[in-house]
Amino acid sequence: MEHQNSQSASYAAAGVDITAGYRAVELMKKHIARTKNEGCLDDVGGFGGCFGLPMASMEEPVLVSGTDGVGTKLRIAQLLDKHDTIGIDCVAMCVNDVICCGARPLFFLDYIACGKNIPEKIAQIVAGVAEGCVQSGSALIGGETAEHPGMMAEDDYDLAGFSVGIVDKKKIIDNSRMAPGDVVIALASTGVHSNGFSLVRKVFDVENNPALMKPNDFLGGKSIAETLLTPTKIYVRSILALLEQVDVKGISHITGGGFYENIPRSIPDGLCAEIDRSAIRILPIFQLIAETGSIPQRDMFNTFNMGVGMSVVVPASQAEKALEILTAQGEDAYVIGTIVQGEEKVILK
């Protein structure tokens, strides 16, 4: 028997299937190939992913990084045994942060930890990651799948990612030019996205609630579980199109902490985003969460995106143009507020 096979057999006895790892890599290669762009310099399988930086048109290129995971939304994917969209969420959580600086995402890396490497499941997860990369213009240049027998149940897995983007230093969006009278525009979300799922799981008792899988008239015939698993919206291409023609002064990715935690991150001291609560197009899933869990409205806005996945601040004189551009990109975009002087960085009225 060859030495390598002996090692593999010993490792398999400890719970790590090297052969399954090889199989998973082969299955995911076709998905990774979809993400290749002009910056890719090598194929998957090396010790490091190489990427050529597009700096010719920039005076002072700056790299912008972001890393995130999907959190306990993974549990919904596991309950539905549907794993081909959760990777979109992982990419979205990272690239939507990177674009808030005005940076164009370049490449992405993923990390999967699992109790047991089931090649077909791993390939489904990576297929979702690849789709997110395609949507954001990112190349998937590397990743890691780690099998953790004895630490995780066989069906369990966790997913995280890392995005790197680039922007010319003079074009970094840093809120320094924001002024009273500027307009706050909302970009609609596709649903809960990837935050607040610990509360969602408690409200709906997801481990013991068969009604989650049944069609729900309030949700347009979709089940609660299906609605919850809807992938996080990726706003990269829409924001890049907006940046080409409009003076964008601030961008907020509405994630964990909702409006109260995320909008202030793009507002400078002395200014306040005054949001018209009645203008927000709250999605039915949030109404259902609030009613089922008897959750106060402020808590909802302090936890969830409530139907607004991203907000941008633009001059009032360019608001109409911004809406036209975003609509042309397929976004449901609308005005939800204005910038005023104030000590509180966000007020919902």
Positions of PLM-derived features:
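Buried hydrophobic packing segments
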Residues: 28, 50, 94-95, 200-203, ...
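Short loop/turn motifs at secondary-structure junctions
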Residues: 102-104, 199, 247, 332
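Acidic, glycine-rich loop-and-beta core segments that form the ion-binding/anion-interacting portion
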Residues: 178-222, 226
